């Protein structure tokens, strides 16, 4: 498997494939090549030092966290399409990570554990059954999207399950049972 931006497809990837097939052992060096777009500035312009529109990923990671930058890039990774990158989008991903942290902390403070088996379905209330059903649907959709290299859609599905279904609905409705 090889991930590569389309800008050097013929200069690098094609050369490696031909070299492997004809100059080495006759085997193709990659079974899959996934082309991704280029990361551009927030206005869709190519990043360059002379324009002054480049970003320092280390700076973004220090300010927003590594996971926020990773999630932003993955969420914009549509196969073969360029993606614009704006600082406020990375900030939004940091807010998403914070939302997940707070939801987990809330659950742990109210007796959730990260080990063991789920209770029998018959003993669950309606809202618990609903969230487990939504989780199962989400896992199935995300697995399918990842298998077809649709990382942006997979991330979007994860985002909406976690933010909308889990945090906005399930946790809010479940708070009464902890009171």
Residue ranges and their predicted role:
Residues 5-6:
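C-terminal substrate/ligand-recognition segments
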Residues 27-179:
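Long, charged, mostly alpha-helical binding arms that flank functional sites
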Residues 11:
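A cross-family detector of function-defining hotspots
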Residues 14-24, 158:
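Alpha-helical support elements that line or immediately flank enzyme active sites
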Residues 1:
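Conserved small/polar residues in nucleotide/adenosyl-binding loops
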């Amino acid at each position: 498997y090889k991930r590569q931006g389309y800008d050097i497809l013929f200069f690098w990837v094609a050369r490696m494939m031909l070299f492997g097939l004809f100059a080495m052992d006759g085997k193709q060096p990659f079974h899959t090549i996934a082309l991704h777009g280029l990361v551009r500035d927030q206005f869709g312009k190519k990043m360059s030092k002379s324009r002054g529109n480049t970003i320092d990923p280390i700076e973004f990671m220090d300010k927003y966290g590594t996971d926020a930058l990773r999630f932003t890039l993955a969420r914009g990774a549509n196969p073969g399409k360029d993606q614009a990158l704006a600082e406020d989008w990375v900030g939004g991903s940091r807010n998403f990570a914070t939302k997940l942290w707070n939801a987990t902390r809330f659950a742990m403070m109210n007796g959730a554990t990260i080990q063991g088996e789920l209770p029998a379905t018959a003993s669950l209330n309606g809202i618990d059954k609903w969230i487990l059903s939504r989780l199962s649907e989400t896992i199935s959709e995300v697995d399918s999207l990842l298998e077809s290299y649709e990382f942006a859609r997979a991330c979007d599905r994860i985002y909406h399950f976690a933010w909308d279904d889990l945090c906005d609905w399930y946790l809010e409705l479940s708070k009464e049972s902890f009171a």
